[in-house]
Amino acid sequence: MNIIQQLEAEQAAKIEAKRTLPEFSPGDTVRVNVKVTEGNRTRVQAYEGVCIARSGGGLQENFTVRKISYGEGVERVFPVYSPMIESVDVVRRGKVRRAKLYYLRDRRGKSARIVEDTGVRARKLNDAERAAVAEEKARIDAEKVAAAQALAAEKAAAEAAEAKAAAEAAAAAETAAE
């Protein structure tokens, strides 16, 4: 492995640690949550459409998503490892026999539909995705519980310190009164 590939692998691993993208291919309907910065505000915008192509490799890998917005076809190219992509959700799996679905640009209506894939591979991928989402949710819930317990312990320690200080002040007042 040369130095460039090694650096790319390290960067890809760093980005994968922050967020993991599901396995998807051309023909799948995906929802891409993109961070949009307007002035000094940042918000998340969902872009849902059909993945019509995946190209490149390594850190330069891209995927193209096409949707019909107000009767007009809109395509957007997203880098897979972009920090602006918050998450990608697979809405449904498509059954296609091409790697590039550029022919959809010329189609309208029913001829532009993609048949849903209900095969074993699609079910396996969907089950794996659901398991990964459930695992991530369980991890986040565990973190929330741990944070709540730490906060409760901190509050209890603060209250105990206050009670101890009040008891010492009362004892000091009694000795001063005698």
Swiss-Prot record:
The keyword Ribonucleoprotein applies. Pfam families: Ribosomal_L19. GO terms for cellular component: cytosolic large ribosomal subunit. GO terms for biological process: translation. Disulfide bonds: none annotated. The keyword Hydrolase does not apply. Transmembrane segments: none annotated. Keywords: Ribonucleoprotein, Ribosomal protein. GO terms for molecular function: structural constituent of ribosome. PANTHER family: LARGE RIBOSOMAL SUBUNIT PROTEIN BL19M, RIBOSOMAL PROTEIN L19. This protein is located at the 30S-50S ribosomal subunit interface and may play a role in the structure and function of the aminoacyl-tRNA binding site. Belongs to the bacterial ribosomal protein bL19 family. This is Large ribosomal subunit protein bL19.
